[in-house]
Amino acid sequence: VSAVVGTHTHIPTSDYRVLENGTAYITDVGMSGDYNSVIGMEKQAAISRFKYPKNKHPRLTVADGPPTLCGVIINSRKNGLAESIKPIRIGGVIDNVGI
C-alpha cells in the first residue's frame, strides 16, 4: 500500500511518516477551504441548522473567506512503496509554519 491518508476532522495532524513497510501515513490531511467557517460553509446557516433541526433551512452556502489548501506530497519508488511524505498547507489561517 503506497499511502493511507485520512480526513474527517478537517484539522491537519502532524503525525505524517513513512511506516516500516513503505506506506506513507497521516491521520488527517486537513481541510481545503475557509477555516473561519463550519467545514467550509457559512457559519450562521450551519449553526442555525444545528440549533433548530426541525425548521426548514435553505441549502448551505460555501464560505467566501480566505482559503487554505491542505494536502500531502508523497514520493514513491518504482515498486509503489512510499519514499517520503510531506504535508502542504498554503494560505488562509494555517500555513506551513514549522513544517
Question: PLM features: residue spans?
Answer:
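Conserved beta-sheet core of the metallophosphoesterase superfamily
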Residues: V1-V62
